[in-house]
């Protein structure tokens, strides 16, 4: 069966990272808790930014979209994971697996692009403050976000289309949490050299280019901060970047743990690293921004308690 006639009835088995019923119950409650915390945290960030006029700035516009992306990202994978923990039927259809993979690739790429745009926003705000209003106009912000969405959608479609050219035969058992590109290539019985080369080439180009852009931006930001005469001003300026820098470090650190390795060395032990980038990073982002950013201090809490306040 080739990529053209993978039947709609074909399916994969998402066996997860443990087949022990006791461990699956523990994993169920752990992932359910993490999912609820992630949803609550990111929804509160979005509501706080949309309801507070003081936060209607380019930086928080992109932060709200980053939270939306993280919310969509965990919803793409965790609900199916939770169902599998509680069910004997762990099957996922071929189309369902490709759909999950498409959104996974697109949303990881979108996260990366938004983080790069946020780095540019901080660079303009700190290194070119007199031009900030014109350089980060509302129209340009919408255009940049549209480009981020467009590129991520196209990249997801490209890799998903290439995967439809791959043949799967024999046991389609995925000892993993969700349909991941590396795992599916690992299960393939046809030649995956072309798609693997395309995955490495495009992935390195996109992610390393944007990482290089962010690194260059922060080098210039740090240089500008060091030239400031006042220590208090240096601290205040750097604190506006600390949250973003923390999120970037967490995002790239966990992503590198999973994907910066040859395909033949990829094994199920990488599930721990996958949990970190697929679940822990979206969960931690709201806390990082809320705790490290002065403008966001208490903002999610105010949204949460607003219905209980007297008019």
Swiss-Prot record:
Residues 50-57, 121-140, 221-237, 292-311 are cytoplasmic. GO terms for molecular function: G protein-coupled receptor activity; olfactory receptor activity. It is a multi-pass membrane protein. The chain crosses the membrane at residues 26-49, 58-79, 101-120, 141-158, 197-220, 238-260, 272-291. One of its GO terms (biological process) is signal transduction. Keywords: Cell membrane, Disulfide bond, G-protein coupled receptor, Glycoprotein, Membrane, Olfaction, Receptor, Sensory transduction, Transducer, Transmembrane, Transmembrane helix. Its main location: membrane. It is found in: Cell membrane. Disulfide bonds join 97-189. Glycans are attached at residue 5. It comes from the Eukaryota. GO terms for cellular component: plasma membrane. Residues 1-25, 80-100, 159-196, 261-271 are extracellular. Odorant receptor. Belongs to the G-protein coupled receptor 1 family. This is Olfactory receptor 1D4. It comes from Homo sapiens (Human). The lineage of its organism: Eukaryota, Metazoa, Chordata, Craniata, Vertebrata.
């Amino acid at each position: 069966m080739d990529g053209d006639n993978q039947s709609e009835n074909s399916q994969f088995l998402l066996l997860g990272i443990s087949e022990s019923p006791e461990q699956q119950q523990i994993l169920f409650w752990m992932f359910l808790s993490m999912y609820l915390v992630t949803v609550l945290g990111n929804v509160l960030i979005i509501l706080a930014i949309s309801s507070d006029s003081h936060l209607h700035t380019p930086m928080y516009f992109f932060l709200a979209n980053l939270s939306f992306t993280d919310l969509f990202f965990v919803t793409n994978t965790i609900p199916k994971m939770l169902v599998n923990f509680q069910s004997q039927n762990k099957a996922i259809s071929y189309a369902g697996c490709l759909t999950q993979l498409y959104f996974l690739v697109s949303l990881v790429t979108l996260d990366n692009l938004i983080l790069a745009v946020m780095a540019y926003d901080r660079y303009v705000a700190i290194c070119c403050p007199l031009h900030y209003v014109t350089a980060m106009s509302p129209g340009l912000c919408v255009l940049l976000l549209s480009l981020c969405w467009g590129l991520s959608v196209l990249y997801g479609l490209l890799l998903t289309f290439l995967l439809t050219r791959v043949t799967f035969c024999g046991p389609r058992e995925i000892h993993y949490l969700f349909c991941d590109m590396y795992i599916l290539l690992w299960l393939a019985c046809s030649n995956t050299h072309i798609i693997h080369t395309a995955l490495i080439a495009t992935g390195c180009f996109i992610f390393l280019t944007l990482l290089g852009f962010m690194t260059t931006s922060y080098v210039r930001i740090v240089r500008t901060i060091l030239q400031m005469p006042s220590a208090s001003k240096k601290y205040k300026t750097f604190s506006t970047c600390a949250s973003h820098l923390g999120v970037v470090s967490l995002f790239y650190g966990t992503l590198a743990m999973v994907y910066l390795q040859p395909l033949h060395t990829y094994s199920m032990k990488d599930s721990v690293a996958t949990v970190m980038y697929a679940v822990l990073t979206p969960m931690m982002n709201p806390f990082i921004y809320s705790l490290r950013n002065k403008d966001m201090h208490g903002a999610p809490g105010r949204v949460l308690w607003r219905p209980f306040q007297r008019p």
